[in-house]
Design a protein with these regions (language model features):
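Membrane-proximal N-terminal amphipathic helix
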Residues: 23-58
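Short, conserved structural patches
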Residues: 117-146
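Aliphatic-rich helix starts adjacent to a transmembrane/signal segment
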Residues: 2-37
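N-terminal periplasmic/intermembrane-space "pro-region" immediately following the signal or transit peptide
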Residues: 54, 62, 75, 91, ...
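Short, glycine/small-hydrophobic-rich surface segments
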Residues: 45-81
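OB-fold and OB-like beta-barrel modules that bind single-stranded nucleic acids
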Residues: 34, 38, 127-129, 241, ...
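C-terminal globular interaction/adhesion domains in large, modular proteins
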Residues: 70-122, 148-400, 404-421, 425-532
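N-terminal segment of the canonical double-stranded RNA-binding domain
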Residues: 1-7, 513, 521
């Protein structure tokens, strides 16, 4: 209501200026009032779109009062029957939905194909303002700018410092000077120092301290740095790409599917791995260095106020999706394979109870029951967003049924389930896959890790697991590993097969954009001459 009031006051003010612009001719005054009315029409539509990201898809079936009409071709009687009068003025405006892709009108049953330009992901409206006999038209183009524009998004192209415990095999580290050793351990040092961009000097950072290991165990010199992750020769990013950092390249990885896929880095460019030969990335998409930063919010806790009371859970939760229903297990809440319909508003929220710890990469499945670890698998038949105050663990294929969308948003990690058996307490990488481990996993989802990474548990263990296919988007604070390679061969974990879901350019899972406050914006604003 406040925003609408501002719009009304702005419009009245603009009209007042026009009305007091004396001694101009009556025609000139009316022309100015007509333009101000057209601006008010654009502001009116933008206000409603800001309140409801799906407003455009309702075509003319929006709540009254409304000035929204199907497009009029200018021939015959004017079909724009919906209009709004400017408060305190005789000026008024109409709004038209300008169809795309050769369509003649916006169809609520097929809004995607009739309103959204297939090449740009944008849509257009026309507002025409009238004052007496004068009229003027403005065409506005709307587009989203957020991480859903990209198949792949990272804030930092360095490994999550949580994984640094793997470099120490879980052994204690210390730094500082003897005998007090008041400096941080290696993992803490990484968390404090490595979340900076490469252009800010991350490559010059180093940790010097001691590690307690050996037989018999003793304190020994330990030196390490921030862990960089490269794009390998066979890596393919099948969609638009953005990192706030810059990329490390080994060989000739491929970025983008065509020139319409932007390949953006906020740094000055890319750098080659000195241990690889022929470093030359294949930019099929449009290479764009020095791109503006995109900022992730710190949490997704706002989803807790959106989810209905029956769809707010606490502690470890297992969800198996099955079409329009789901089966839920949650010991904290006394639920054991309880069948439920998917939520009407499409939002599920899982909060921490009594937790007290984060992700332990060397022992990922022993977190307290009160931790918001959400295990999810299955096939979903309606749009859905699952949010977690801690982690989301995909423990089976996650696939869509029909034209549906799934969002997975975790404050911490989004993980792929991979249990293993450790064979040597002193070597974390000496481990094997457990029986029945998942191979060739498929995930149809928009994935967002706000504070950490999308990763595979125990990615460094066992024989290769086939292909990890993600159809959607992947957004993460730190680069998350899903396997290990030797040259062009995968030796542990998964081979990546990441593909952009082009629907994400103009659609989103329910309330998925709320945590990052992404919305439609006006990307172009031009007057149409002659007016319609």
């Amino acid at each position: 209501m406040g925003a609408l009031l501002v719009i009304s006051l702005f419009t009245i003010s603009a009209l007042a200026v026009a009305q007091n612009d004396l001694p101009v001719a009556r025609k000139d005054q009316d022309t100015k009032q007509a333009y101000a009315a057209a601006e008010a029409g654009i502001a009116d539509y933008f206000f409603h779109l800001s309140q409801d990201n799906a407003y455009w898809g309702k075509c003319t079936g929006v709540p009254a009062p409304t000035a929204v009409n199907q497009a009029w071709n200018g021939v015959g009687a004017d079909t724009r029957t919906n209009s709004r009068l400017i408060a305190g003025s005789s000026a008024w405006y109409t709004i038209e939905l300008l169809p795309a892709n050769g369509a003649t009108s916006c169809s609520a049953g097929n809004a995607q194909n009739t309103m959204i330009d297939a090449n740009t992901g944008t849509f257009r409206i026309r507002a025409t303002g009238h004052s007496r006999t004068a009229k003027r038209s403005i065409v506005a183009t709307f587009k989203r700018k957020n991480f859903l524009d990209y198949l792949y998004f990272t804030d930092y192209e360095t490994a999550d410092p949580t994984w640094y415990t793997l470099d120490t095999n879980g052994h204690a580290t210390r730094s500082g000077t003897s005998p007090t050793w008041t400096g941080p351990d290696y993992v803490t040092w990484g968390s404090q120092n490595c979340p900076v961009y490469w252009r800010q000097g991350r490559g010059n950072l180093g940790y010097t301290g001691q590690i307690f290991q050996g037989s018999p165990a003793s304190w020994q010199t330990f030196v390490d740095n921030c862990t960089e992750i490269q794009f390998a020769p066979n890596d393919k990013i099948n969609g638009p790409f953005h990192t706030n950092d810059e990329i490390l390249v080994c060989g000739t990885p491929t970025f983008g599917r065509n020139a319409q896929d932007r390949v953006e880095v906020s740094g000055p460019g890319w750098r080659g791995n000195g241990g690889c030969s022929g470093n030359s990335p294949n930019f099929v998409g449009t290479w764009t260095p020095n791109a503006p930063l995109l900022t992730l919010p710190p949490t997704d806790n706002s989803l807790s106020t959106v989810a209905g009371s029956s769809y707010r859970f606490t502690g470890r939760t297992t969800i198996v999706l099955n079409g329009a229903n789901m089966t839920v297990t949650n010991a904290t809440m006394g639920l054991n394979n309880v069948s439920m319909a998917l939520p009407a508003n499409g939002v599920i929220w899982v909060a921490n109870g009594s937790c007290g710890q984060g992700y332990n990469p060397l022992d990922p499945y022993n977190a307290p029951q009160g931790c918001a670890d959400v295990y999810v698998q299955g096939s979903y038949g309606s749009d859905l967003t699952i949010g977690s105050e801690k982690d989301i663990i995909v423990n089976g294929n996650l696939t869509k049924s029909g034209d549906t969308m799934l969002g997975l948003i975790a404050n911490n990690f989004v993980r792929v389930y991979h249990p293993e058996t450790h064979n040597d307490a002193n070597d974390a990488t000496n481990c094997t896959n457990q029986a029945g481990v998942m191979t060739n996993v498929s995930i149809d989802a928009a994935i967002l890790s706000l504070q950490h990474s999308f990763t595979v548990d125990n990615y460094y263990c066992g024989t290769p697991l086939g292909t990890l296919t993600v159809n959607g988007v992947i957004g993460q604070k730190f680069r998350g590993p899903v396997g290990r390679g030797n040259g062009q061969s995968v030796i542990n974990g998964y081979t990546k097969n990441y593909n952009y879901d082009d629907r994400m350019r103009f659609r989103s899972p329910p309330h998925f954009l709320d945590p990052i406050q992404a919305a439609w914006r006006i990307s172009r604003y031009t007057e149409q001459i002659p007016p319609r």
